[in-house]
Amino acid sequence: MAGLLKESMRIKMYMEGTVNGHYFKCEGEGDGNPFTGTQSMRIHVTEGAPLPFAFDILAPCCEYGSRTFVHHTAEIPDFFKQSFPEGFTWERTTTYEDGGILTAHQDTSLEGNCLIYKVKVLGTNFPADGPVMKNKSGGWEPCTEVVYPENGVLCGRNVMALKVGDRRLICHLYTSYRSKKAVRALTMPGFHFTDIRLQMPRKKKDEYFELYEASVARYSDLPEKAN
């Protein structure tokens, strides 16, 4: 429940996985305000550094995976905050237009004033001469996730654009969010949108990265036609 969450919450993240067969581990620490929808994270690669691929493909598993820090307007039930103290999980498949695929599973739990994230990722089929494996990407454009409930699961569908020089590499994201609480204990939100701006203000030698995200959940601003 939202009462367990404070205006300032800490974050700890533990990530491991492979991308095109390269094994790595990352650890992150950060903080944010769950009620204003802003968060920051500082991430170190603890194994497998320097990464031989663009960290940009992992960034959405960190911040865009940190769904407690989404500002929900008053009329939208907050699925994620309702899920505490038990927490929630999500699974995501990201398909890039050049054939690369990234799958991820994340577990979110709460320990005192700290949110704990455990993330496992698997990246396959990224072209050796593509921008991901050549580390030629330059961050993400802002995007909007379409969110809706289905059989007790919150589904997210998104199209993201990775900046590559003067062009964009497009990818499609399919996410399933599952509360650890029984569905009957939740008030599920209706169809809505989540606007996301994910940035990387700083990185160092492909082994240290700083991320910032702002996100807000909203209904459509467009009025319905009167009868």
UniProtKB/Swiss-Prot annotation:
<dbReference type="InterPro" id="IPR011584">
    <property type="entry name" value="GFP-related"/>
</dbReference>
<comment type="similarity">
    <text>Belongs to the GFP family.</text>
</comment>
<comment type="function">
    <text>Non-fluorescent pigment protein that is lilac in color.</text>
</comment>
<keyword id="KW-0455">Luminescence</keyword>
<dbReference type="GO" id="GO:0008218">
    <property type="term" value="P:bioluminescence"/>
</dbReference>
<dbReference type="Pfam" id="PF01353">
    <property type="entry name" value="GFP"/>
</dbReference>
<dbReference type="InterPro" id="IPR009017">
    <property type="entry name" value="GFP"/>
</dbReference>
<feature type="modified residue" description="2,3-didehydrotyrosine">
    <location>
        <position position="64"/>
    </location>
</feature>
<comment type="subunit">
    <text>Homotetramer.</text>
</comment>
<keyword id="KW-0599">Photoprotein</keyword>
<keyword id="KW-0157">Chromophore</keyword>
<feature type="cross-link" description="2-iminomethyl-5-imidazolinone (Glu-Gly)">
    <location>
        <begin position="63"/>
        <end position="65"/>
    </location>
</feature>
<protein>
    <recommendedName>
        <fullName>GFP-like non-fluorescent chromoprotein</fullName>
    </recommendedName>
</protein>
